[in-house]
């Protein structure tokens, strides 16, 4: 790969790492190139974002690099967040919501384990739509955030309490459990 290709991959990895970010050392290991080269590419990217009046910037905090939006554009991002939602919720968000509804309080790592994939974006979507909320921290190593459904979740789905959720049969295989949850949430997919 040439330097421009590495630059493109690093840019993509910064985007894919989301809020967690990525260290130069991780990038070096992933790309199998020297740390000095990675740091040089990161500086080039940072300079390009600043020089070209782009909407993004690279920030560094505690040796972790993040791709972020520029603060001077924040009024536009607020408008986007405040605008009425016309988009449907993704299948990943519906699966995540079902897991949280039936297993709450639950950490994102536990959700990831059940789904078999990372759930950072679906969790963020559900928080943005006020369907879930943070409820504290689990008393374990790292003290991860616990999530639960919100009052808006109950209102939206026409439930008085969580006890009104359709019961999941005992001794159900995981595939069938997912289908049962999908059936419940499927009728709301177009509305959410």
Swiss-Prot record:
Q: Does the keyword Cytoplasm apply?
A: yes
Q: Which domain of life is it from?
A: Bacteria
Question: Which keywords are on file for this protein?
Answer: Cell cycle, Cell division, Chromosome partition, Cytoplasm
**Where does the UniProt entry say this protein principally localizes?**
cytoplasm
Report the InterPro entries cross-referenced here: ScpB_csome_segregation (IPR005234), WH-like_DNA-bd_sf (IPR036388), WH_DNA-bd_sf (IPR036390)
Cellular compartment(s): Cytoplasm
A cellular component annotation (GO) from this entry? cytoplasm
What biological processes does GO assign it?
Answer: cell division; chromosome separation; DNA replication
Secretion signal, residue range per the UniProt entry: none
**Function of the molecule:** Participates in chromosomal partition during cell division. May act via the formation of a condensin-like complex containing Smc and ScpA that pull DNA away from mid-cell into both cell halves.
Subunit structure comment from the entry: Homodimer. Homodimerization may be required to stabilize the binding of ScpA to the Smc head domains. Component of a cohesin-like complex composed of ScpA, ScpB and the Smc homodimer, in which ScpA and ScpB bind to the head domain of Smc. The presence of the three proteins is required for the association of the complex with DNA.
Q: Which family does it belong to?
A: Belongs to the ScpB family.
Specify the protein name. Segregation and condensation protein B
- Say which species the protein is native to: Oceanobacillus iheyensis (strain DSM 14371 / CIP 107618 / JCM 11309 / KCTC 3954 / HTE831)
Which lineage ranks, top first, belong to the organism behind this chain?
A: Bacteria, Bacillati, Bacillota, Bacilli, Bacillales
């Amino acid at each position: 790969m040439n330097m421009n290709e590495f630059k493109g991959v690093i840019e993509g990895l910064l985007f894919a790492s989301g809020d967690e970010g990525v260290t130069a050392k991780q990038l070096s290991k992933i790309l199998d190139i020297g740390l000095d080269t990675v740091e040089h590419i990161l500086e080039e990217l940072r300079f390009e974002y600043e020089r070209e009046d782009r909407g993004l910037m690279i920030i560094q905090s505690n040796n972790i690099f993040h791709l972020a939006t520029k603060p001077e554009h924040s009024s536009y991002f607020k408008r986007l967040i405040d605008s009425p939602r016309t988009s449907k919720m993704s299948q990943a968000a519906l699966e995540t919501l079902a897991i949280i509804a039936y297993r709450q309080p639950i950490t994102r790592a536990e959700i990831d384990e059940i789904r078999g994939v990372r759930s950072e974006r679906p969790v963020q979507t559900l928080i943005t739509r006020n369907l879930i909320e943070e409820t504290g921290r689990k008393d374990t190593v790292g003290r991860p955030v616990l999530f639960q459904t919100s009052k808006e979740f109950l209102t939206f789905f026409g439930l008085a309490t969580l006890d009104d959720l359709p019961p999941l049969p005992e001794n159900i295989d995981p595939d069938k459990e997912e289908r049962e949850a999908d059936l419940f949430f499927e009728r709301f997919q177009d509305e959410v």
